[in-house]
Amino acid sequence: MRSITPVVFLALVVACAPAPQGLRAADEGPGPKVSFDVFHTPLPEIPLPNDFATRFDALSPTKRRINASIEVAPTRWERRIRAALDDISGWGTLAPITVSFSEPLDLRELTRRHQAPGDLADDALYVFDVTRGSPGFCQPVLLDLGQGHFPVVADDRTYFPEEPHDALESLLFEQQEEDLNGNGVMDPGEDTDMDGVLDHPNTLDGKTGGPFDVIGFYEHETNTLIARPLEPMREATTYAVVLTKRLVGKDGKPVRSPFPAINHLSQTQALGAVSECLSTQALGLDDVAFTWSFTTQAITQDYIAVRDGFMGMGPLAFLKDKYPPEIATLEEARRSEGRGTNTKIVPGAQFANLGEQLLSFVGGSDVTDGSKELIRGWLRSIDFFAAPTMVSPQFFPRNDSEGKQLPFYEQTMKLDPLRGIAETRDETVPMFMAVPKNRTGPAPVVIFVHGHTGSKLDSIIFMGPMARFGIATIGLDAVSHGVGINDADISLFSGIVETYGITPLANAILKGRAWDQNGDSIPDPGADFFSAYVPHSRDTVKQTAFDVIRLVRVLRSFDGKRTWKHDVNKNGMADDLAGDFDGDGKVDLGGPDVPIYMAGASLGGIMSSLVGGIEPEFDAILPILPGGYLSEIGACTALGQVKNPLVLRLFAPLFLVRDGPANPTLSVMYPSAVKNVEVKLASLPTLPPGSIAVMRNLKTKDWRCARVQKNGHLRLAVPSDEGDRLQLELYDQELPSQEKTGCDPTGVTPVKVVDTLDREVKFLGTTIPAGSKLTAFADGYGLRRGSPEMRRLLALGQIALESSDPANFAPFYDGTRTLTYGDGSTVKTRALLVPMTGDPGVPISTANALMRAAGFLDVRKVDPRYGKSTQQQLIDVGFVEGVERTRRYTDAMGRPVLMDADVLQSVRAGADDGFGAPRLNPPMRLFGPSEKIGGTVGALLPYMDPKGAHSFPIPDPGKSFDLGSLLLNIAGGYLGSGGTRVAVEACAERSNCDWFPPIPP
């Protein structure tokens, strides 16, 4: 098993080898020293990312693999996740760059130098591309060091019950002052969160402040500088981080190298271009205090290999024959009405009334009578519906050789093109399809992906507007997704559809890829899609991308010549043209030259913005509620269906006492699919406020401490594998402080030990009898909020997620970076991104990062409308922060509101959304013609709710301003024009533009 040993071994070899030369000798003297301690526990303390912590692998595309220090992880499941990291070919392209010091830095001097990201003349820190031959050779990476591109203020500040430090603004950084008497010493009782550290606010000056004062570019507790790339770095490329002498401590002295030279001697060759790169900034090696190198991972190789494989090329060429481009089944859609009835489709007219009810099901109470009338008109543009399926190769396993489901941390892709490894299994991908009327040939197609925990049924709101513009819509279920309803709801649903004679279509729609993940007999869509099992989450995203790429191949195969096995014309022969769903002898959609688009919302917005940068066949994409920097989405989202499986797993097992002090009861909280479950375990004696509880993991010999709060409540956790024996100990005296564990109970006798359940417990479908030993019911990291461990783990998570992160693929849209396949095709995709102002689900800051990566937001260029860059303008007006409770702005009633940056209501005189929000003047309007690929590209910034919203507005012509109709008509017009027209026009809001295709009677 690999461990920390290779890193230590390299350190010893270099120490004992003949002295090689560094770039130059380091300066002597005082000043904060860079921390570089490979023996530090629990993890080495070195600047990261760093090629010092990689190992050679001849079959890696970069000749490197990460060494993630497997042995130091306390639990089996964390070791397996770290082992998956060891397979990655290099460091992150978006992940933070961190370096710790022996003493605090002068943060005001640092922020003064780094105020303007585009002005690098006097920066203290640089990151250069030092790979000769790279298109970005010697170009500096733009960095955020507190300029506001990555706000730390979370929309939902609550991260589960009984937090010892409540009302923190961030998941990652401390805000509480524990040194109550200001003596600089941890006095008894001051360590209220029992982390073994005297906490101070993570603000610029370390003093208590408001929400805007918390900083994310520096961690006071560890003296760690945290730099965030503003744009994705290039894949499989070596970079140098250069700390200049301008980076100083509080005494004004420059930071120092930990070595006799300004670099580790093993990296001198890799850093050979640093002097040349520094000269571009009028600097030289004499200006350098310390430098190190790192190599980014390859992020495109799997997509290239799989797509080429589908076309019979490259190391995975077998995929073409094993998975030919074909529709596997055409599901029954309606009852037969006599001989010759095509039961594989439902005519649009037969579906119309049901479609209206389904839209009400999807849209809820927002669907008004006016909405229904408008929707009925759109649905009249649909010729027929169908429910095809395809078989798609899945590159990660679900079960072991005996058919038992694998833990999620073992459900990772067995895909390594350079080694010729591609283990696949078959999985049926169900789809829901609508084909427009008035076709003069095969219809263009938009592939629509639903939101997280949704299904292909969500595409119904898109189908009518797309059909009006002559576009067919295919909704597909992403990995692990489908309609998640219980038997009673299924019966109700079936009863409704039976009235319309299309029960078979309803049954086909209900077939999905979701399954019961928590033992309640109800499918749990998406429960494992975004979770703390990060390599698995990465691979669910990648697999969904592969499914979409395969669907594109299927659509392109409808060439008007090939036949398929489906006898839709009922002549008893397999002579129907592939793609002829209605049996009229003509291909209905797709084909070699027909435009193909992609769209989706939330998860679908993430998927369409990802695959839009991967698949060359897309003419245009329309991601709604999209975002990049996936680890940031996970850490900052307010969506419970993501917070529970991801963030709660980081805290779990979360032991709570919530009903003290009279009758305290110990309970535990875990994720339950996309929800959480809390079960009571045992009664406890009265817990005096300020007393201490210790939870021990008897298997790992690890423990954590917590202090009983003033109200008698308690919260504590310990890292655990499922099944580990645990023991709660209660103490009535102060225990010595200890870092990591929080306290040291050695030699002190607890007043009470709880290691047994005093009642029957039901957990995720399992009954545990009273008298059973206290165990961990599931895996959990047992982390604390606002801790360096949490921050480091999320940084590792971003490294694991890079190959599935849309922001990494956005530069491919317009060819700013080139992605070319074996058939010579190159990605050139027109994109219109539609994030929602103040989105708390896919935080608007992550959509902002995606827009920046795509080139739709400029960091360097001054926009004459504002006298600053568009990016800086959005930061300054609070758009990037996107949290109204900070009260940057209030309405006439004094209620907190967000700034409206695009002012879409101004498209029509007299339109009013009624929000009374401040409006940016002039509106931002981040879209326009593309010089590189033609057409129109960019982003819209709709304002749906003054507090922000993670949803799409239902069209309602009865409103003074109908944002829903405007956006759907913009979507239809954009894709219908091949990505050339963005109809921010009054007639689009009223659905009556003279250039709109007429709605059939």
What is the role of each PLM region?
Residues 110-114, 137-140, 238-242, 250-262, ...:
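Short, solvent-exposed loop/turn and secondary-structure capping segments
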Residues 532, 536-543, 610, 616, ...:
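C-terminal subdomain of alpha/beta-hydrolase-fold enzymes, centered on the catalytic histidine
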